[in-house]
Every structure is written in structure tokens, then in C-alpha cells.
């Protein structure tokens, strides 16, 4: 169905994809929002299934998602605006408008996880157990959300030749043709990597019972893919000459490796 819309909804006369799915009572409903909402809904169903696997009440998982999600969205926008502050020229309306994109996933994860940690401590719940359940849902939502970037014509790489882009399906070629130039579809690489990570996490949650391994597995795997893909993008948030996402990804990989190593050593000691 989505592929059908990819061919139907084009900007009139331009041949490029239209980021607006439809208009409702004068309000433009964009694919970016639809895909994020779809990811959230699928994530909720996935969390319900995984809560049964880990024998945790779904109500607790749902509560933490409903609290962390809006805070995560606020954090994602705040993070993005901080690093792009000069481009807004003090325009507050543009700063809070997320309909055209501009959500930095690292900001969303930091703020969302912080909210989840505070809530779990308040309710005396295991933060790591809850995040193990949430991790597959988060990466699944990210995988779908990248297609929202596709419709917005963002999160792509640098210019490429037609001989490069012609290897991709026609609708990808169309979406990555911007102002007469072909661009590297890095959104597709990240979406694919996220789906692969989702599958790995679903296997982990069934096989590994150690608290936190699924969540930190998510942190490490996502960071690994993001580090390399970020190097190809043209719209990176920058801190001087450094790509912020690559810096955060390195930290994510180190933290993930440290936790999983610690968990493995601890399990070995207990089993002796």
C-alpha cells in the first residue's frame, strides 16, 4: 500500500514525492507523522508481546512508554534545535514545528531514557527489565521513521551518479532525485540496519535472560550502524568539525560493550 502511494502522491509538475499524504479540514497530514505514529502503534503491540515473554505487567510497560514518548519527542526536537540554533534566527514557531522533520533520535533517546529511569525508580520497578522490553519496539519505530525522512527529502547522503542510483527501485530513484540531482539514499541503509537490529533483539529477548543485555545490545548495534551511515550524510549536526551523531555513537558502542562484558563476566562467576 505504501509503495502504491509512493507512485501516486507526487508534487504536481515536479516528479518528486509529496511529503503531504492528505489534507484534513485544511490541515496537512504528512507522511512523516503518519510513519512515526505507525511505528509507535506497532511498537506498543510488540511491547505487549515481549512483556509476556519477560513476565512483566504490560500496564507498567505502557505507563513508561506513555510518559517517555512525549518527553522523548520534546528532547529530540530540543537536541536538534540546539545544534541548529543559528538557522532559526530566533523564530520560536519554526523551532517548535516538527511537521517538516527535525527530530534528532539521540536527543529523543537521552530524554526518553531519563524519563523512564526516573519513573521506574519512583515506582520501584526494574529500569533494565523495562528497557529490555522497550528496545525492540524503539528500533522498529526508528526503522519506519526513516521512511518519513525519505518523504521529506532529508537524511540522505551526497550527490551520486545515475549509474549508482539506478541500482535501486524506481521509487527510491524518484525520491532521491532532488533539484535535478541524484542523492545517496542513506535513509534506506539506516532503515535496513534498524530492521536487522530489530530481528537480532527479538532473538536476544527470547534467548538471553540477563537484565539489560537486550537494551544495551540495542544501544551498541544501533550506534555501530549509525556511526558509519552518518559519515555519508550531508545534514549532520556538527560540533565544530565533529559530527555529533558519530561522537555519541562511539560513546554508545563503548557503554554497550562495557555493560555486556560486565554482564557476561558476572554470569560466569555465578555459574561457577
UniProtKB/Swiss-Prot annotation:
Pathway the protein takes part in: Protein modification; lipoprotein biosynthesis (diacylglyceryl transfer)
Primary localisation category: membrane
Protein's membrane topology: Multi-pass membrane protein
The entry's keywords: Cell membrane, Membrane, Transferase, Transmembrane, Transmembrane helix
Keyword Repeat appears in the UniProt entry: no
One GO cellular component term: plasma membrane
Cited PROSITE patterns: LGT
Known EC number: 2.5.1.145
Keyword Membrane found: yes
GO function terms (MF aspect): phosphatidylglycerol-prolipoprotein diacylglyceryl transferase activity
TM annotation in the entry: 25-45, 64-84, 100-120, 185-205, 212-232, 244-264
InterPro entries linked: Lgt (IPR001640)
Subcellular location: Cell membrane
Binding site for a 1,2-diacyl-sn-glycero-3-phospho-(1'-sn-glycerol): 146
Biological processes, Gene Ontology terms: lipoprotein biosynthetic process
Family per similarity comment: Belongs to the Lgt family.
Job of this protein: Catalyzes the transfer of the diacylglyceryl group from phosphatidylglycerol to the sulfhydryl group of the N-terminal cysteine of a prolipoprotein, the first step in the formation of mature lipoproteins.
Protein name: Phosphatidylglycerol--prolipoprotein diacylglyceryl transferase
Organism in which the protein naturally occurs: Clostridium acetobutylicum (strain ATCC 824 / DSM 792 / JCM 1419 / IAM 19013 / LMG 5710 / NBRC 13948 / NRRL B-527 / VKM B-1787 / 2291 / W)
Amino acid at each position: 500500500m505504501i509503495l502504491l502511494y509512493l507512485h501516486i502522491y507526487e508534487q504536481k509538475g515536479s516528479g518528486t514525492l509529496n511529503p503531504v499524504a492528505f489534507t484534513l479540514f485544511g490541515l496537512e497530514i504528512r507522511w512523516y507523522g503518519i510513519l512515526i505514529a505507525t511505528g509507535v502503534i506497532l511498537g506498543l503491540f510488540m511491547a505487549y508481546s515481549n512483556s509476556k515473554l519477560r513476565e512483566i505487567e504490560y500496564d507498567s510497560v505502557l505507563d513508561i512508554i506513555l510518559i517517555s514518548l512525549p518527553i522523548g519527542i520534546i528532547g529530540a526536537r530540543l537536541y536538534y534545535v540546539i545544534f541548529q540554533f543559528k538557522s532559526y534566527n530566533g523564530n520560536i514557531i519554526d523551532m517548535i514545528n516538527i511537521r517538516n522533520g527535525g527530530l534528532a533520535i539521540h536527543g529523543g533517546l537521552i530524554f526518553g531514557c531519563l524519563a523512564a529511569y526516573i519513573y521506574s525508580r519512583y515506582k520501584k520497578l526494574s529500569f533494565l527489565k523495562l528497557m529490555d522490553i522497550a528496545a525492540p519496539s524503539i528500533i522498529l519505530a526508528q526503522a519506519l521513521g526513516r521512511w518519513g525522512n525519505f518523504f521529506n527529502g532529508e537524511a540522505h547522503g551526497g550527490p551520486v551518479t545515475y549509474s549508482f542510483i539506478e541500482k535501486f527501485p524506481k521509487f527510491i530513484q524518484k525520491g532521491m532525485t532532488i533539484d535535478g540531482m541524484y542523492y545517496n539514499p542513506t535513509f534506506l541503509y539506516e532503515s535496513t540496519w534498524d530492521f536487522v537490529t530489530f530481528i537480532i533483539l527479538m532473538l536476544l529477548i527470547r534467548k538471553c535472560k540477563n537484565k539489560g543485555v537486550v537494551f544495551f545490545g540495542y544501544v551498541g548495534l544501533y550506534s555501530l550502524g549509525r556511526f558509519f551511515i552518518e559519515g555519508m550524510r550531508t545534514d549532520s549536526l556538527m560540533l565544530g568539525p565533529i559530527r555529533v551523531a558519530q561522537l555519541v555513537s562511539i560513546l554508545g558502542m563503548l557503554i554497550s560493550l562495557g555493560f555486556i562484558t560486565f554482564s557476561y563476566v558476572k554470569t560466569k562467576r555465578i555459574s561457577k
